[in-house]
Amino acid sequence: MSLLATRQRPPRTAPTVAPRPGLWRRIRAAKWSYAYLAPMAVLLLAFVVYPIFASFGYTFYRWNGIGEPGDYVGLANFQQILHDRIFWGAVGHTFVYAFVLVPVQLVLALALALVLNNPKLKFALFFRTVYFIPVVTSAAVVGVVIQLMLANFGDSAGSLLAKTGVTDGQIDWLGDPHTALAVIILIGIWHTLGYNLVYFLAGLQTIPAELYEAAKLDGCGPVQSFFRITIPMLRQVGVVIVVLAFIGSFQVFDLVQVLTGGGPYFATEVVNTYIYHLAFGGSPGSAAQPDVGLASAASFLYGLLLIVFSALQVLALRGIGRRRTAA
């Protein structure tokens, strides 16, 4: 028997795994990272986390915001909000605003993004800046300017529509319950269009140009390339854009508050202006005196509605994406 055959092989041993360091050791290893995060964490706790818990506590009291809350009412605030027709009207107006604004705005933003993404377009940067200027303009300033424009030119537009037979006479654009919400929606579409335009531009610029070149060689036209390449490649970013667009539209407040204050006759009252009027008073039919407890209850109920809607929205968009992928 040869020497190689008789030589004993060393026993195989499992590779040693270093023990996982403890929590304190991991914190010490990243101490500077936590030190840099500490100021933001303190601000988050002070201005986000604490107000949420404090506001939830106020829902059980009748309180005008002065002194300490002392009139404990249990769930009466929630019951009053649930039976308030103005609250449900405000919810309806908010959803109408969102479900009209978001689809129209997304279609316009995608169309403009396709045009501005064309490398042959001259002055593309200038046009991008022009479309984004309304976004960086305060909604309060926009509201005041729109009021001045309607005061100076609204009668002329109403006269023109009356002469063409579209309307029967002059229109008080923000004072008529039938037109006020539509005017606010149109202004909202224009004011926040730049956000979604930038998002779509960013998504379009991630699509490789080789895909369009290959599709062109295969005989695909612009319409086929749009539905076969652009839409599928924008699916992931499109979900994010849709969710963010709905979240932003559900938070509408300043534009409505400046233009109409929720009027006329609560025709444009949205949930955020409703909560504002409850918390600070001054809205006929809502609360003559401030009631922080009612405002907190309304905000929590509205928050629950938005959580449920957002979850259903994400699930629906994911289901649509999976069906398209399977097809």
List each model region and its residues.
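Short, Lys/Arg-rich, polar N-terminal cytosolic tail immediately upstream
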Residues: M1-I27
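A structural signal for multi-pass alpha-helical bundles of membrane permease subunits
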Residues: A29-A327
